């Protein structure tokens, strides 16, 4: 285990780009772990994946901490998203492997014009607050539809845009994303492929609490009772995988069972979908690599989780 050390905090875009270029000139692989802060063990596992990403070359690890307003709709929880920058720095220092933290005050041009919808007709917290200052958006047209994209129409547009901006600023060789946000991971993979970013995207496995709850910064908002009820998500996913591996591969039956379980435990289901792992195309029968994706509300907290299944293995 590496000895604890303080990472350098960088807030300026030009300084961040220059830092990365110096590290690359030194023969290092630059790896980035994008986060919105309020770090937990799941985030630290992404850092471990970044540290292991370059076996041949030394690696310089950048963690970004930036709560991106363009991926939140005005009705969503931007204002209450948890934050503890000092605590985050302590956690990052404890790993001993993080070289820099990119924590910009803002990454968007702020306009003073009228409020209005940008391309696609969707309005985010950014547009509501800043008018038409920012006008350029990155969209992954098909993969952003359905699942989280159905109930959060600005989300993936905001994610793809901010990640593109971070990639252009940091110029990493490697970027690590958690597979808990499965659709987001696939959207980023497709964006990198389609736009010819010379970046390796690593998907890191879900990290769970001892009782199975997927780690999330939003878990802090759950009451004790809500948290106990929320365990029905991971338990229903494990049951579904167990059943599928035993031959229960009818997707309609599987989805209905998960919805029933979550509803009976007090959850409000946003969606349950079974899709091909790479294309995210819904399937009716499990006969290859699929992922079951779930989003549900417990109290005022929206939680997502998923489980990969391959009945061929």
Curated annotation (Swiss-Prot):
> So what does this one do?
Catalyzes the condensation of pantoate with beta-alanine to form pantothenate. Essential for panthotenate biosynthesis.
The top EC class is ligase
Subcellular localization: Cytoplasm, Cytosol
Q: Which HAMAP family does the record cross-reference, listed alphabetically?
A: PanC
Q: Which residues form the active site?
A: 43
Sites binding beta-alanine sit at 71
- Can you say what this protein is called? Pantoate--beta-alanine ligase
Kindly state one GO CC term assigned in the UniProt record. Answer: cytosol
Quick one: which residues bind (R)-pantoate? 71, 184
Q: Which gene encodes it?
A: PANC
**Could you describe the subunit structure of this protein?**
Homodimer.
This protein's pathway reads: Cofactor biosynthesis; (R)-pantothenate biosynthesis; (R)-pantothenate from (R)-pantoate and beta-alanine: step 1/1
Please tell me the species this chain comes from: Oryza sativa subsp. japonica (Rice)
Q: Which InterPro entries match?
A: Pantoate_ligase, Pantoate_ligase_C, Rossmann-like_a/b/a_fold
The similarity annotation says:
Belongs to the pantothenate synthetase family.
What does the record give under GO molecular function? Answer: ATP binding; pantoate-beta-alanine ligase activity
Name the residues that bind ATP.
36-43, 178-181, 215-218
Task: Give its E.C. classification number.
Answer: 6.3.2.1
Catalytic reactions on record: (R)-pantoate + beta-alanine + ATP = (R)-pantothenate + AMP + diphosphate + H(+)
* UniProtKB keywords: ATP-binding, Cytoplasm, Ligase, Nucleotide-binding, Pantothenate biosynthesis
């Amino acid at each position: 285990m590496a000895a604890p050390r303080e990472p350098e905090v960088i807030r300026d875009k030009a300084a961040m780009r220059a830092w990365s270029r110096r590290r690359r000139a030194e023969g290092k692989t630059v790896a980035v772990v994008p986060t919105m802060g309020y770090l937990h063990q799941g985030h630290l596992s992404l850092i471990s994946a970044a540290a292991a990403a370059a076996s041949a070359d030394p690696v310089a690890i950048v963690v970004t901490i930036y709560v991106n307003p363009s991926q939140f709709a005005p009705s969503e929880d931007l204002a209450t998203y948890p934050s503890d920058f000092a605590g985050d720095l302590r956690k990052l220092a404890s790993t001993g492997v993080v070289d820099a933290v990119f924590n910009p005050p803002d990454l968007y041009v702020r306009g003073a014009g009228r409020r209005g919808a940008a391309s696609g007709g969707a309005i985010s917290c950014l547009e509501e607050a800043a008018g038409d200052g920012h006008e350029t958006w990155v969209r992954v047209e098909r993969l952003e539809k359905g699942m989280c994209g159905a109930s959060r129409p600005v989300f993936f547009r905001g994610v793809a845009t901010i990640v593109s901006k971070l990639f252009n600023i940091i110029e990493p060789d490697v970027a690590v994303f958690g597979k808990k946000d499965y659709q987001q991971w696939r959207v980023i993979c497709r964006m990198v492929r389609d736009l010819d970013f010379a970046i390796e995207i690593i998907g890191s496995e879900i990290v769970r609490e001892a009782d199975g709850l997927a780690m999330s910064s939003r878990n802090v908002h759950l009451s004790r009772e809500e948290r106990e009820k929320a365990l029905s998500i991971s338990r229903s996913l494990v049951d579904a995988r167990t059943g599928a591996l035993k031959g229960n591969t009818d997707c309609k039956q599987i989805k209905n069972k998960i919805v029933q379980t979550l509803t009976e435990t007090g959850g409000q289901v946003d969606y349950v979908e079974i899709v091909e792992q790479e294309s995210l195309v819904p399937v009716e029968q499990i006969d290859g690599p699929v992922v079951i994706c779930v989003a549900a509300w417990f109290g005022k907290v929206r939680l997502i989780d998923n489980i990969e299944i391959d009945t061929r293995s």
